[in-house]
Amino acid sequence: MGFIKYAVRTRATFATAACVMLLAFSVGAARSADDKTYVMKLGTATINDAQHEWCKRFVAMVEKDSGGRIKGEIYPASQLGPIPREIEGVQFGAIQGYIGPPEFLVGVDHRYEVLSAPGLINDMAHGIRVTGDPELQKMMFGLGDAKGIHGVAIWASQPSSIVAREAVRHLDDIKGKKLRVLAADMQQEALKRLGASPIAMTLGDVLPAIQQGAIDGAVLALTVDATMRYYDAAKYITETNQPFIFSMAFLSKKWFDTLPGDLQTIINTDASKAAAEVNPWAADFYGQETEVWKQHGEVISLPPAEQAEMIQTLQGVGAEVAKRSPDLEQAYNVFVAAAKRTK
């Protein structure tokens, strides 16, 4: 009888010890997961502009709010490779983020081109307001979910302009010109309506193509022209203001899904905070870089009547291209509604 009681007590002791050990192991594993450092490599094609500024602010916020559990690394000026390679890297988890205009992701989902629709955004202030629209954010952030991309931020960059080797002072000067555009049907169709020949090209190839005379110019952001010293090859910028340029931050869903829930919340929250801070910064930067360009080249505006004529010519481009695909048309309608709500 005593032996049986001893055996029972011994088993109970072992069971208790096992539970204690299991609990200690679980707590230790949880602490280990909490203490793990996650590297977040962010790539962008530009440098010293709003996209680069967003990266710096975002990384500073995330490192602080995560207590150092996320370590950010920023690679501007295509240091991680050409734009298509950076996007692929994000999809497969080789890098953690790409920052740039959504039109570069049309190969991932053609709806990313919807923000290229001309004539919907009136000015910088309107562009900033529309980026805060919840319905537009929800759509744009979710377009890449099935393709390994998690959208986290959107902000207004600036209106488009044409940088060219020869001055574009009138609408007729655009006709026959070979101009670089993003790989978006809406941008290409817009230039065709103006009589130009659109050529899709990644950013790293644009300046050499202008220098070599392979193209006459490009539809670009003035701040990119100025910070990358395009004035050494093409001294004329014409502010057409269409289409408006937006930037987005795209993270690797493969990487994001491995993060603990609290870090996911920090990233999503800080991404939006950084975008809100960068919006006014981008507006000021646009004005500053316009003055920088004037020191090296010329900034041209079309005559008011011709600017109005151009807007009229481009007005239906978005709706026409959107009709080619039901899901693109649905996305276009979301953008139109957001633009109207924030006008």
Per-range role (PLM):
Residues M1-V39, T342-K343:
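Short, low-complexity disordered leader/linker segments with a strong preference
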